[in-house]
Design a protein with these regions (language model features):
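Conserved catalytic-site region of short-chain dehydrogenase/reductase
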Residues: 310
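Catalytic nucleophile serine of serine hydrolases
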Residues: 305
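Conserved P-loop NTPase catalytic core
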Residues: 321-348, 354
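Flexible phosphate-sensing "switch/lid" loops adjacent to ATP/NTP-binding sites
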Residues: 1-293, 297-300, 317-320, 343-344, ...
Length: 471
């Protein structure tokens, strides 16, 4: 909305916890939520927009990334004690953006009234106080209990924090907003804060930050071609497959139960934040045996990043890079490659050309973000030829109808999707790849951003929001 009104806008979230991440043009890692926000604002994603990224690697531990660089693994208690030391990094990133952009829109994390976590807060009201920012408090009515959410949050805040709240917003409402009016009046009386609008539940298709459940698991294969993405426990960067979901020929299913696997036309093994644990899960759940049966039946399989590593012969972690302990596991054995984890993380934004049939000649753009090095056995055909800043190298592997590579975002280009359909899927069902034109994924995203902006603008008192910012 601010960008549509002519302002140069930057998103900002001091600390984000997510499995889906992105590599900027200068090789820094950041959360995808701020990438999507930057794209909506029409600006280049910048690691300053998300200076701290936490990538969960277990139920109690995360990889800590600061200014796009890995600092190491930390458990939750240790990070909570240590995070106050990162406030200078957060403020430096914010101040730099504030000097460069007309407006900086800050996203908090969770609830600002988690009183057990308020000490040394660097992401919610503590950050708002540090940068002297007004606050809009939004409640999700789709989850129920929105009046209690908003009233309880305001009541638990300190007086100096309550003074920062410029207004309340009800989000994701379904039905007749007039029925809410009595409750809104009472909420304003109880909190002393104006309700700036009720945003309806809008049918837009914008990448999820992490949760598959609300959007992706509902997709069923009622279309011509059945594509299965294996739903790994630590699945990451599932946005790799968003362009396939919007294609009229493809039904994309996310499957964790072998009973739901069926006989798909193509299987995608996605990235993961914990390759070793998810490889064990494949084995123990019966998914490995099921995938091997599908391979024997001629079903093509593509592994991306961690999925590529699992398709190989072995995965070794001699230094305990992933979980803090040395391990070596047998892979699925479908690609003649071996992976060894090291402490160094690869982060690049290369351009590439597919080398191996049936993808040969397809131009790819994407990014690499992974730990470990994969070595191909002698005579193995690499999948792509990469070039970045004048340096050239090969990546990935192919063996029969199994493919693997480290490159995320390979389906973002419509040319790649068309090649994918023509070369593999349509060969199985004899359906012309041109039966349904593939829209540019970027153009599709822009339409969704505009639809969301139009719906939110119509629902909110935008003038009051501008006034709260002194604009």
């Amino acid at each position: 909305i601010f960008a549509q009104d002519g302002y140069r806008v930057a998103p900002f979230k001091s600390q984000n916890m997510a499995l889906n991440s992105f590599v900027t043009r200068n090789g820094a890692e950041m959360g995808r939520a701020q990438v999507v926000q930057a794209q909506a604002a029409g600006v280049e994603p910048d690691v300053r927009m998300n200076p701290i990224l936490l990538k969960p690697s277990s139920d109690t531990g995360s990889q800590v990334i600061v200014h796009g660089e890995v600092w190491g693994q930390m458990d939750a208690a240790s990070y909570f004690r240590w995070k106050k030391n990162l406030l200078p990094d957060v403020l430096a990133a914010y101040d730099s953006l504030a000097e460069e952009y007309d407006l900086v829109v800050i996203e908090g994390a969770g609830s600002p009234a988690e009183i057990n976590l308020k000490a040394d807060d660097i992401v919610n009201m503590g950050l708002a106080r540090a940068v002297d920012a007004p606050v809009l408090l939004a409640g999700d009515i789709d989850r129920g209990g929105v009046f209690a959410q908003l009233y309880g949050t305001v009541a638990l805040l300190e007086e100096v924090e309550r003074a920062r709240i410029a207004g309340l917003i009800i989000n994701k409402f379904r039905g007749d907003a007039a029925l809410l009016r009595p409750g809104l009046v009472q909420l304003e009386q109880l909190t002393g804060k104006q309700v700036l609008g009720v945003v309806p539940y809008l049918p837009v298709d914008i990448d999820d930050e992490d949760s598959l459940a609300p959007r992706l698991s509902a997709r069923q294969t009622e279309k011509a071609l059945d594509v299965v993405v294996v739903r790994l426990p630590h699945l990451s960067n599932f946005t790799d497959f968003t362009p396939l979901e919007s294609h009229s020929l493809l039904g994309v299913r996310y499957v964790a139960d072998i009973r739901a696997l069926g006989l798909p036309d193509f299987v995608l093994l996605p990235g993961t934040k914990n390759t070793m644990d998810d490889l064990l899960w494949l084995r123990q759940s019966g998914m490995e045996a099921a995938l091997l049966r599908l391979h024997g039946a001629g079903v093509p399989i593509l592994g991306v990043c961690g999925g590529y590593q699992m398709l190989g012969e072995t995965v070794d972690d001699p230094e305990g890079t992933e979980s803090g302990r040395s391990r070596s596991l047998r892979g699925l054995g479908l690609l003649p490659v071996r992976t060894v984890f090291t402490g160094e993380k690869t982060r690049t934004r290369p351009a590439a050309v597919a080398l191996a049939e049936p993808f040969a000649g397809a131009r790819l753009e994407g990014y690499e973000i992974h730990m470990g090095r994969t070595v191909l056995s002698k005579g193995t055909v690499p999948l792509v030829y990469m070039e970045e800043e004048g340096e050239q190298r090969q990546d990935g592997a192919q063996s029969d109808h199994v493919y693997g590579c480290y490159m995320h975002g390979i389906f973002d280009m419509s040319e790649t999707v068309k090649t994918f359909l023509a070369a593999v899927l349509c060969a199985r069902r004899c359906i012309p790849a041109t039966a349904s034109p593939t829209i540019s994924h970027r153009a599709y995203e822009e339409r969704q951003f505009d639809a969301l902006a139009d719906g939110v603008r119509a629902a909110l008192d935008v003038d009051a929001i501008y006034q709260s910012m002194g604009v």
